[in-house]
Amino acid sequence: LYNEAQLSDNPSLTESQLGFSPFVIDMFRTNEDPIMFPNVDWNDYLFKNLAWQTQHNLTLSGGGERFRYFVSLGYLLQDGMLKQLGESYDPNYQYKRFNYRSNVDIDITKSTLLKVNIGGHVGAKREPRTDELWRKVLWSTPFSSPGIVDGKLISNIYSNRYISIGERSCPLDYYYNYGYNVDTDNVLNLDLALEQKLDFITPGLSMNIKGAYNTNYNVKASRTPS
């Protein structure tokens, strides 16, 4: 089709001036040399048909006359849409989160109640270090690279002198050669409440003392292949 478009614009072009010579077309047809003349569907090569999400929750509650508790634990894993193609590390998109909550009521005395509530989460988001990947998948030609062959990434076929058109960069360069970032977020919320009944002064009178501590910090880490 590219040749036909060229001839439609300029019918006087010779075979040597066309984007794809008969030799090149025949090499694609026979798949005789898939290294020098690859034909890769990058969407199918790189992307999964689906990305799994798993979530688990555990809840416990109980206690006795003077001690009562509630504990909730949760874990979430969201996998990415990109395939793992055998490299020694995985730069795929991923999100993991562990969340927790604990509520404890303690009757210190018959008139004194202590409430301790703890909650928070730890989340880690991983993603490739470049935002060029999606654009390169759309722009790259099927013959820009054969991908990973025998465990080795063949990024660009600069020696291929037979084809000079199209985007020659390989999406795998932007997937594997730039590394990845991991962004970890840690949130902790703690609050305490002390309830003291003062019926000995006036029936129904009580005193509440409350305190809270909240913290949130973020850690960013990067890995770049050597």
Where do the PLM segments sit?
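Individual transmembrane alpha-helix segments
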Residues: Y176-Y180
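Membrane-embedded beta-strand positions of outer-membrane beta-barrel proteins
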Residues: V71, V116, L192, M207-G211
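Short, solvent-exposed loop/turn segments enriched in Ser/Thr/Gly
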Residues: V187-N189
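Flexible loop and strand-edge segments within Gram-negative outer membrane beta-barrel domains
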Residues: P34-G74, Q78-M81, P91-S169, N181-D185, ...
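N-terminal, post-signal-peptide soluble/periplasmic segments
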Residues: L1-I35, K110-E127, D131
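Carboxylate/His-rich catalytic cores and anion/metal-binding grooves
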Residues: N216-S226
